[in-house]
Amino acid sequence: MASLLTKPKPVFLCSPSLSPRTLNTATPSLNFTRISFTHHQKLAPFKPPSLVVAFSEKGLKRDVTTAAAATEGDYRRIMLSDVLVKKKEKVVWWEREWKAMDFGAVAVVLSMHLLSLLAPFQFNWRAVSVAFGLYIVTGLLGITLSFHRNLSHKAFKLPKWLEYLFAYCGAQALQGNPIDWVSTHRYHHQFCDSDRDPHSPLDGFWFSHMNWMFDTNTITQRCGEPNNVGDLEKQPFYRFLRTTYILHPLALAVALYAMGGFPFIVWGMGVRIVWVYHITWLVNSACHVWGKQAWNTGDLSKNNWWVAALAFGEGWHNNHHAFEFSARHGLEWWQLDMTWYVVKFLQAIGLATDVKLPSEAQKQRMAFTSD
């Protein structure tokens, strides 16, 4: 059992309720160990898997053994899920190497959370309206439409003035400048749910949710220095945003204070930023733990309806990992995808061009196949 799991090939844990599925050849072959769970398995009382199946780049290799190790403590179950991952040695937070950027990230995230705690004492409807409006502007237009679908995946093209405007909206979400955000996300897709993934639940739910942001040394060890964003680094506008990044949210805070005083700061900055933080982070954590898989992506990505509702369609995450180039994540008519509706509107008025969608042939290649 131990020798099987230590080989440099993806490994999946499969339940007796469903037969093992063949790893789709569209998934890149990587040198890592991967633990997953069965397709469409519903939450139920914990039962150890009955077999282990090892995959290689050539497809399914039926090296099957009993999952005795799963009952002997080699695996742990991720919180409130049916996902089993191999146990790793825990790194004590305060004993690891901390860099200045780590302290800075903790300070920013903590200060926004503390500021949001004042919301009940600074409530007024104008401030709430401003927070909601900025949630749309920074969350939908900035993060999901610009940083994610446009810049990270090139799912469509926009006129440069509009591309830059939406990217500026994303910078106001206080999640990092476009170059760094896009680099991390591209590495996530390249090394998805492996030991080199910047934020995988293989390292625990909370690591994938937020703790990864406070450990730049680990991310550098996994991914190396960012070298996958040359398309953005060659553009002066994005280099400018990287250099001056923190000044832009500060300028917005000053403007909000001038418009509505401290309540606008609490709601328009604190509450809104924390809300968009956790919605974005849930895509990295919850959507790799809770939900269903519609496509044979060979990773832990899930379709999660409630994250999709909060994150403007980003919760259809298994769809996204199956067709990362697609401007549309909610592929079924009933899958709400507000970001796609905005892209579709921009396309209708001639502002979005080269809008990419998966073909029927591509869908067939990513579909689960019966044994």
From Swiss-Prot:
Range of the transit peptide: 1-67
Motif (Histidine box-3) on chain: 317-321
UniProt membrane topology term: Multi-pass membrane protein
GO MF terms held by the record: palmitoyl-[glycerolipid] 7-desaturase activity
Catalytic activity: a 1-acyl-2-hexadecanoyl-glycerolipid + 2 reduced [2Fe-2S]-[ferredoxin] + O2 + 2 H(+) = a 1-acyl-2-[(7Z)-hexadecenoyl]-glycerolipid + 2 oxidized [2Fe-2S]-[ferredoxin] + 2 H2O
Predominant localisation class: plastid
Pathway: Lipid metabolism; oxylipin biosynthesis; Lipid metabolism; polyunsaturated fatty acid biosynthesis
Name assigned to this protein: Palmitoyl-monogalactosyldiacylglycerol delta-7 desaturase, chloroplastic
Lineage of origin: Eukaryota, Viridiplantae, Streptophyta, Embryophyta, Tracheophyta
Gene designation: ADS3
